């Protein structure tokens, strides 16, 4: 792949393409007003053309405002921006899928989005609350049919509301439920999962490559925040690894840049999140060097099968994806 800051798109299985690096806009626990707006504008100015967001992040209005401002300035055309939105777990019932996507479009004030993905295979009780809870404070689960949800997404694509469809946090079995669906119209183009040198997801990558189905989009490509609600805080911090530090010195790059370069050389799409302008710029500067085959093998050997984002609070959900090996 001959990728550059000016041209770093890779083809998807439906004829569309995706920029190999994007800006993640997840904010933990809640966004600081105005920060996402500035981050997205900074990213577009730097050369990013892929923005990853979600209605559940509570900042899609700022993402849309930033995109529209940059289009109005003439910095980019709308068709040059790739936006990925997500269907949340309370909207899995087929009749709720299109209204959820339309709500995202209204929030963004855009006519279409480029990719819409099922954020998690686990469904929660439908309603206004993102995390509906019972009297004991436990999230109320909901039985859904992933194939029926997918058919509703296919109808959204046919209606021109979205160009490509994908999934997130799906294991192999759940992905195959969609792929083996009778009458499948559109395959998922991506499966967005946690992936980094401590959790290389080699088997899931092999499944994607062998079936020529979906690209892996790596979230938390640099490790992640250390919020104990979501994250196993006993896991080792990735960016302090000695090998990454030594390679950074060799190439005059940061550990983060080494990791992101490793990921894109593996063919992964990466969506590092940041609201810090300097870091947003730094994360994009990965097209002016490449790692050797030996260095790639050395970084791959760092794998510890450490999953930072375990979502253990939902581990008793029937569709909890991480009981399976991959």
Swiss-Prot record:
Sections of the chain in a coiled coil: none
Posttranslational mods: The N-terminus is blocked.
Binding site for NADP(+): 22-26, 52, 168-169, 192, 219-224, 273-283
Keyword list, A-Z: Bile acid catabolism, Cytoplasm, Lipid degradation, Lipid metabolism, NADP, Oxidoreductase, Steroid metabolism
GO cellular component, one term: cytosol
Residues annotated as binding substrate: 26, 57, 88, 119, 131, 230
Active site (UniProt): 57 (proton donor)
Cellular location(s): Cytoplasm
EC class (word): oxidoreductase
Keyword Lipid metabolism: yes
Catalytic activity reported: 5beta-cholestan-3-one + NADP(+) = cholest-4-en-3-one + NADPH + H(+); 4,5beta-dihydrocortisone + NADP(+) = cortisone + NADPH + H(+); cortisol + NADPH + H(+) = 5beta-dihydrocortisol + NADP(+); corticosterone + NADPH + H(+) = 5beta-dihydrocorticosterone + NADP(+)
Entry's Gene Ontology BP terms: androgen metabolic process; bile acid biosynthetic process; bile acid catabolic process; C21-steroid hormone metabolic process; cholesterol catabolic process; digestion
Pfam families, per the entry: Aldo_ket_red
Entry's EC annotation: 1.3.1.3
One MF annotation (Gene Ontology) recorded for this entry: ketosteroid monooxygenase activity
Activity regulation statement: Subject to inhibition by high substrate concentrations. Inhibited by testosterone concentrations above 10 uM. Inhibited by the primary and secondary bile acids chenodeoxycholic acid and ursodeoxycholic acid.
Family, as annotated: Belongs to the aldo/keto reductase family.
Functional summary from the UniProt entry: Catalyzes the stereospecific NADPH-dependent reduction of the C4-C5 double bond of bile acid intermediates and steroid hormones carrying a delta(4)-3-one structure to yield an A/B cis-ring junction. This cis-configuration is crucial for bile acid biosynthesis and plays important roles in steroid metabolism. Capable of reducing a broad range of delta-(4)-3-ketosteroids from C18 (such as, 17beta-hydroxyestr-4-en-3-one) to C27 (such as, 7alpha-hydroxycholest-4-en-3-one).
Protein's UniProt name: Aldo-keto reductase family 1 member D1
């Amino acid at each position: 792949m001959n990728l550059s800051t000016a041209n770093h798109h890779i083809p998807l299985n439906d004829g569309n393409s995706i920029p190999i690096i994007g800006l993640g806009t997840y904010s933990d626990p809640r966004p600081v007003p105005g920060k996402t707006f500035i981050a997205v504008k900074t990213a577009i100015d730097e050369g990013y053309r892929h923005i990853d967001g979600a209605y559940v992040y509570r900042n899609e209005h700022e993402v849309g405002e930033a995109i529209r401002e940059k289009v109005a300035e003439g910095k980019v055309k709308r068709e040059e921006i790739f936006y990925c939105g997500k269907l949340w777990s309370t909207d899995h019932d087929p009749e709720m899928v299109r209204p959820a996507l339309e709500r995202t479009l209204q929030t963004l004030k855009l006519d279409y989005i480029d990719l819409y993905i099922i954020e998690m295979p686990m469904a929660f009780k439908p309603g206004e609350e993102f995390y509906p809870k019972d009297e004991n404070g436990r999230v109320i689960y909901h039985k859904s049919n992933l194939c029926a949800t997918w058919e509703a997404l296919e109808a959204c694509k046919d209606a021109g509301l979205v160009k490509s469809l994908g999934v997130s946090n799906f294991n192999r079995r759940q992905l195959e439920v969609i792929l083996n669906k009778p009458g499948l119209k559109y395959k998922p183009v991506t499966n967005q999962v946690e992936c980094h040198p401590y959790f290389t997801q080699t088997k899931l990558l092999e499944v994607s490559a062998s079936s020529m189905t979906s690209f892996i989009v790596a979230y938390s490509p640099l490790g992640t925040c250390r919020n104990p609600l979501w994250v196993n805080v006993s896991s080792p911090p990735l960016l302090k690894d000695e090998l990454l530090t030594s390679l950074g010195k060799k190439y005059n790059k940061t550990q983060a840049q080494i990791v992101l370069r490793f990921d894109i050389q593996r063919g992964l799409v990466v969506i590092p999140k940041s609201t810090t302008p300097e870091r947003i710029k730094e994360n994009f500067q990965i097209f002016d060097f490449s790692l050797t085959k030996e260095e790639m093998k050395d970084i791959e050997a760092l794998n510890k099968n450490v999953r930072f984002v375990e979502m253990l609070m939902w581990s008793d959900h029937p569709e909890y994806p991480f009981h399976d090996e991959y």
